[in-house]
UniProtKB/Swiss-Prot annotation:
Top-tier EC class: transferase
Its job: Catalyzes the methylthiolation of N6-threonylcarbamoyladenosine (t(6)A), leading to the formation of 2-methylthio-N6-threonylcarbamoyladenosine (ms(2)t(6)A) at position 37 in tRNAs that read codons beginning with adenine.
Domain Radical SAM core intervals: 133-363
Binding site for [4Fe-4S] cluster 2: 148, 152, 155
Transit peptide is among the record's keywords: no
Catalytic activity: N(6)-L-threonylcarbamoyladenosine(37) in tRNA + (sulfur carrier)-SH + AH2 + 2 S-adenosyl-L-methionine = 2-methylsulfanyl-N(6)-L-threonylcarbamoyladenosine(37) in tRNA + (sulfur carrier)-H + 5'-deoxyadenosine + L-methionine + A + S-adenosyl-L-homocysteine + 2 H(+)
Xref: PANTHER family: RADICAL SAM PROTEINS, THREONYLCARBAMOYLADENOSINE TRNA METHYLTHIOTRANSFERASE
Name listed for the protein in its UniProt record: Probable threonylcarbamoyladenosine tRNA methylthiotransferase
Keywords: 4Fe-4S, Iron, Iron-sulfur, Metal-binding, S-adenosyl-L-methionine, Transferase, tRNA processing
Amino acid sequence: MVKIYIENYGCARNRADGEIMAALLHLAGHEIVYDPDEGEIVVVNSCAVKDPTERKIARRIKELLDSGKKVIVTGCLPHVNPDVIDERVSGILGVKSIDRIIQAVEYALRGEKLISVPDWRKRNLDKLDFPRLSPRTVYFIVPIAEGCLNACTYCATRFARGVLKSYSPEKIVGWVKWAIKQGYKEIWLSAEDTGCYGFDIGTNLAKLLDEITAIEGEFRVRVGMMNPNHVLKFLDELIEAYQDEKIYKFLHLPVQSGDNDILRRMGRNYTVEEFEEIVKEFRKKFPDLNLHTDIIVGFPGEDDEAFQRSVELIRRIRPDKVNVSRYSPRPGTIAAKWKQLPGWIVKERSRLLHRIRLQISYEINQKYIGKKVEVLIHGEGKKGNVDAVTMNYKHVILPFGNSGEFRIAEIKNATSTYLLGEVMS
């Protein structure tokens, strides 16, 4: 038997895949270690959503191989751009082949190489049927679906994850109940797009949330990213479900651009006005809503006027956080074939929007100073402090506190990225 380290990249959905592989390897008698130096085999569970991430992972694989480690590559990269994977690796598994991880390790130990990257149409796994080996943290990731219903012209993730496959509400609820019995206090509902959950099996996210919040116990639910075009189909029902106190008043709603022509080129299937309508309705019901959104700058065809509309949108809706991404062409996507903007323009726009979003975040967070808020303590942070989150998922740094406790904290200071508080006696 062998010591194995699993290095996860990317989304929560991918981390859950890593926990499945860890459980399968553990049950097969292998030792899962949490320091890469201890691992005889390193599983690099990759992400391919952006070019910089891809290059970082490729460098990391080379570094591990040069240090004498055996490396097995899993995740989205084998589907999206296998050519960047060092040929010296000991195995390659796609996202639909993670159940073959034991076999891949056996091959590697014999000096052989297992490659299994099936098309998502040819092999389907219900990943809620597999065991999990999760870190003993406060939160537990529950995947609710794999794949999506969009066809964005810039996205290569769909080549790996495929079309939407929603997991049954019964299995999801079963995992949530299990996690709560194990002592987890926070449930992350994860998918490529939680907004389209259930559309393929005759249900939706709001109905699922109602089932989850009906479970007994003191816990909170963090809902993952949802696309506006799907939310529009059941907006009132979703807002109603969000009223339960167990659901964090946190909304990750990516807009990607403030220009309708660019949204059409992206294949996003909604307008800026529809995005703003969702935000308005949520804020009407939840004034303290923690709104996160995403913006891609430098998309092909984005002129100065289109970019300015994105800037104006962010200034108008004032999200708590904006994830600003510089567009990078991904292999096999439609947008990669279009005329690209000069890199210096993309960089300049990214820096400008980043400065604006930091200022907005700072101004919003300053308004929390002096407030007393309920927090869930996550555990030890940096410099001897502890990390916590409010009931709208604002990050708070506290001087002390026990992991998994719900406490009242008074906010004493704030930056653009977190709040600083004191635990009330």
